[in-house]
Amino acid sequence: MFKKNKFQILFTLFALLLASLACTMNIGGPDYPETTIQPSEQAVKNMQEQFKAAFASAATSGDVILTFTEEQLTSVLHYRFAAQNNPLITEPQVILRNNTMDIYGKAKQGYFVANVKISVQVGIDENGEPTINVVSSDFGPLPVPEGINTTLSAIIKEAYTGAVGPVATGFRIEQIGICDGFMVMAGKVK
C-alpha cells in the first residue's frame, strides 16, 4: 500500500511539473494602468480618415493639426507588434500624460512573462520629423533588451509614418504636445 501511495504522489508531482512547464509564469513588473484600452481597427481607420481630412484642409491654409488619442496609438502599436514574429512587447497600452508617452505591455523571455513600462518623450528634429527618446524602461525582473532606444524609436516612427502614410508628404512638424490622453502635432505642409 505504501508503494502504491508513493507512486501516486510521484505521478501527481510529475504531472504538475509538466503542466507548469507547458504554461508561462508571470513574474511581475510595473503595474498596468487601471483601465485598459481595447485596440480596434476602427480606431486606426478613424485616425487615417482624420489625417486625410486635416491634410485636405491644409491644401488651402498650409496649417495642419493632428490629434492622436490613447486608443488610436494603442491600436496602431497593437497591430504593428502583432504583425511581427518576435515582438518586443505584446498587449500594448499607451497612456499620454504630462508630455510623456507611457507604453505598457508584456515581455516574454522563455517561460517567463513580465509587465513592462517604457516612458518616452516625443520631440521634433531639425527636419520637422518626430523624435522618440526613451526616458526610462522597466522590464520587471527581466533584463532590458540591448538597443531598446533604437528599436523602440524605429517601431514608433514606423507606426507613425505607416499610419499617416502618403497623405503627410511634405508635412513639417513645428510643435508636439502630450496632455490628458491626447498627443497633438501642429505643423505646416511644405
Region annotations inferred by a language model:
Residues 2-10:
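Bacterial N-terminal signal peptides that target proteins for export
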Residues 24-190:
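Extracellular/lumenal and peripheral-membrane lipid-interaction modules
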Residues 19-22:
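C-terminal motif of bacterial Sec signal peptides marking the signal peptidase cleavage site
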Residues 13:
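Short, charged/polar micro-motifs that form catalytic or ligand-binding hotspots
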